[in-house]
């Protein structure tokens, strides 16, 4: 690469054409004055005023771009991670020494709220500039993969924010200087710790320039590079697309900085001007890249793939354990050597409650649909939520679909019964009871006999699968398998469980017009046999007396 100090006036004009759009009206003034490369690197605010660049904002944009050229021209062979840390430490020491010497002066008055002197502000600006130069290295590969350096980077950013806030805050000079001294002391400690703890040779290696040729680019294929522009005009490659010209070259890595495109320096340019320069020659591109040292971090290219969100697969059974053959071990080692894929943000499913898309079947609980057609199943992945659609179709069915279920063992497949939630009729006299099925009584009574396979267990499961639709409890015929006997006068009652009172009971089939009768064991019923017999014998006599009175009234 030709040094910037050797640029001709034409090269300076070509470089200024890629700067911000607001600076384009001044290009002809650079061309008129025939400013060369050496004059460009030494340009100042006063020189820009003479050129006709009167706006302060426009002057700052030009000077920032020139600073990048100065760093490229003078600091390429000297800038290392170690030197940048030392520069930051020296800047913090200079600011600390300035404040200490200023406080020793007899004319020092820290109880005033005047603006700090220019020397103080200049030292602060130099410190922040040194921190920015170090952060530019820490924010790029291979240093982003080191945990300790990532923590150091975050601390330096926070300290720089605290420093700028303290300087701009309207307060006493002594108070402001105390805050600045605290920040400076922490920065000194970070620099010392970084120098002591880091022994990798990459800290002492400088960046280098490498020229990359991308020939034979097919029309419409593209180069396959992902470029991110920083706020100050640096263009950093973040990754490459797999099997693209950039990926096939094996020379373009994430973290590389684009310096030239087709022999034209693009440092400080707008990103759109850089892209236009890349598309200038459709058959091929020549890039000049600035590469950070790799050292012992084994940094490899990082291709990017176009990934879509896919739901996690549900593993129904554990995979069979097989011994690895030498061929499979070799394939695994080859896969490890492939470039790692950069982490992409893959959007998760929507956070709102998901409602499956279905045009033919309605899964709502409003109507009493008796349709017995099999549920439709989608084929393929129509959307990221197609997995949720299929899952909802497996889970949702109405009571009318219970006849379609295949036979299975109730003991092994039925989930534990849970108490129903509060319903609108909660608290009314009508008791909330469960049906008189052996399956449900087996949960209430741990000594009950297990039920066998049959349709009755399936009906019970499907009838009470949902808390929202519970069919009327029907009377169940007496069976000799029941452990508990009932009196003759209570044959119209069915056996159930009262979850309100926490006991078992006999329930009439019509829950709306019956009361709950406490269930008693056989032993306890023997004691009350005489009382129940008296009550049963007393009922006919009471009826006869009422009939006799009715006859007397009719006469």
Swiss-Prot record:
Keyword rRNA-binding in the entry? The reply is: no
Chief localization = cytoplasm
One BP term from GO = negative regulation of ERK1 and ERK2 cascade
Q: Which PROSITE patterns match?
A: CRIC, PDZ, SAM_DOMAIN
- In this chain the PDZ domain maps to 211-293
UniProt keywords (A-Z) are: Cell membrane, Cytoplasm, Membrane, Phosphoprotein
Q: Where is the SAM domain?
A: 7-72
| Coiled-coil features, chain-numbered ranges | none
User: What InterPro entries does the record point to?
Assistant: CNK1-3_SAM, CNK2/3_dom, CNKSR, CRIC_domain, PDZ, PDZ_sf, SAM, SAM/pointed_sf
Q: Which is a Gene Ontology cellular component entry for this protein?
A: apical plasma membrane
- For the modification Phosphoserine, the affected residues are 381, 383
Q: Where is this region: Disordered?
A: 308-333, 362-389, 518-538
Q: In which tissues is it expressed?
A: Expressed in kidney.
Where it sits in the cell: the answer is: Cytoplasm; Apical cell membrane
Ranges where the CRIC domain occurs: 80-174
Its placement in the membrane is given as:
Peripheral membrane protein
Ranges of Low complexity composition bias in the record: 311-329
Q: Does the keyword Cytoplasm apply?
A: yes
Q: Which residues cross the membrane?
A: none
The record describes the protein's role as: Involved in transepithelial sodium transport. Regulates aldosterone-induced and epithelial sodium channel (ENaC)-mediated sodium transport through regulation of ENaC cell surface expression. Acts as a scaffold protein coordinating the assembly of an ENaC-regulatory complex (ERC).
Instruction: Copy the domain comment.
Output: The PDZ domain is required for interaction with ENaC and SGK1, but not for interaction with NEDDL4 and RAF1.
**Protein family membership:** Belongs to the CNKSR family.
Q: How does it assemble?
A: Interacts with epithelial sodium channel ENaC. Interacts directly with SCNN1A (ENaC subunit alpha) and SCNN1B (ENaC subunit beta) C-terminal tails. Interacts with ENaC regulatory proteins NEDD4L, RAF1 and SGK1.
Instruction: Specify the protein name.
Output: Connector enhancer of kinase suppressor of ras 3
Organism whose genome encodes this protein? Mus musculus (Mouse)
The major lineage groups are:
Eukaryota, Metazoa, Chordata, Craniata, Vertebrata
